[in-house]
């Protein structure tokens, strides 16, 4: 699992929830590290902040779509929830599996619940 977020506090919450459930997790806080992390880690789940400094989430979504990324993506942002939903819709039309969305700030239990559903339940195409 890969967490892509520029806020260390958010990253720590997701990492703690993931490790609690037995996931191996890596985190990056800079979009310049994104491609290398995808190729090296080969994550099956990505938590992606769509409003980071540098390249925006849509550019990173484009990178994943161009490579037919087979895993699940969780879109998250501190922006308006409509922006998260719009970004998720665009990602779906580009062929990505959106496993859920998170509006910041969120609680650790929300991440735990989402990860449990990703591990056992259906996903959206």
Where on the chain are the PLM-derived regions?
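Acidic, metal-coordinating helix/loop segments flanking the phosphotransfer/catalytic sites
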Residues: 27-45
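Conserved phosphotransfer cores of two-component systems
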Residues: 39-41, 64-70, 93
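Acidic catalytic/metal-coordinating carboxylates
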Residues: 29-30, 56-62
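Receiver (REC) domain active-site loop signature in two-component systems and cognate sites
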Residues: 52
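Alpha4 helix (beta4-alpha4-beta5 surface) of REC/receiver domains from two-component response regulators
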Residues: 59, 79-100
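C-terminal output helix
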Residues: 82-83, 103-119
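Conserved acidic segment of CheY-like receiver
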Residues: 1-9, 14-18, 46
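The C-terminal output helix
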Residues: 96, 115-125
């Amino acid at each position: 699992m890969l967490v892509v977020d520029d806020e260390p506090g958010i990253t720590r919450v997701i990492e703690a929830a993931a490790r609690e459930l037995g996931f191996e997790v890596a985190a990056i806080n800079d979009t310049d590290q994104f491609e290398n992390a995808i190729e090296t880690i080969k994550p099956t789940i990505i938590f992606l902040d769509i409003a980071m400094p540098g390249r925006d989430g849509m550019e990173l979504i484009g990178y994943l779509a161009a490579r037919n990324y087979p895993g699940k993506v969780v879109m998250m942002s501190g922006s308006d929830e409509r922006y998260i939903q719009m970004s998720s819709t665009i990602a779906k039309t580009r062929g990505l599996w959106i496993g859920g969305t998170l509006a910041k700030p969120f609680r650790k239990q929300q991440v735990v619940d989402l990860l449990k559903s990703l591990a056992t339940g259906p996903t959206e195409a």
